[in-house]
Amino acid sequence: MAQKKRKERRYVPYGVAHIHSTFNNTIITITDPNGAVLAWASGGFFFKGTRKGTPYAAQLASESVAKKVQQTYGMKEIDVFVKGPGPGRETAIRALQAVGLDVKSIKDVTPIPHNGCRPPKARRV
C-alpha cells in the first residue's frame, strides 16, 4: 500500500474574523487574508434552542475558534468584521482578545437597505 503524504502545516500569522450575530445565533468564521476559511464555530456548537443566541454562547464559540487557529496556523493578528444586531457581537470580540489574538481593526459590515425590500409586519404580542 502506498504511503500517505503528510500534509505540511501552513503558517498564517494574520487573518480575518467574520462575526455574524443574529438574535438567534452567533457564527464566527476565521479566514486567511484571501478569504479561505481556516476555522469556524457557532453558538449551536455548545447550546441548543434559545441559548444559542446568548452572549455566553458567542464567547465560547469565539474562544474555541481563536484557540484552534492559534494552535494550527500560528495566528497572532486579526481584523474583525461584525455583521448583524445580535447580543453576541461585543462578547465575541472580547473573547478573541482574551485568548491572545491581537485585534488590529474592527469594522461593522451590517447590510443596510437603501429603501429596498419591505420589512415584515410588526409582531403583536
UniProtKB/Swiss-Prot annotation:
PANTHER family associated with the record: 40S RIBOSOMAL PROTEIN S14/30S RIBOSOMAL PROTEIN S11
Function: Located on the platform of the 30S subunit, it bridges several disparate RNA helices of the 16S rRNA. Forms part of the Shine-Dalgarno cleft in the 70S ribosome.
InterPro entries: Ribosomal_uS11, Ribosomal_uS11_bac-type, Ribosomal_uS11_CS, Ribosomal_uS11_sf
Gene: rpsK
GO molecular function, one term: rRNA binding
Family under the similarity heading: Belongs to the universal ribosomal protein uS11 family.
Source organism superkingdom: Bacteria
Pfam families reported in the protein's UniProt record: Ribosomal_S11
Keyword Acetylation: no
Protein name according to UniProt: Small ribosomal subunit protein uS11
Annotated GO CC locations: ribonucleoprotein complex; ribosome
The keyword Metal-binding is annotated on this UniProt entry: no
Gene Ontology biological process terms, A to Z: translation
Keyword vocabulary terms for this entry: Ribonucleoprotein, Ribosomal protein, RNA-binding, rRNA-binding
Subunit field text: Part of the 30S ribosomal subunit. Interacts with proteins S7 and S18. Binds to IF-3.
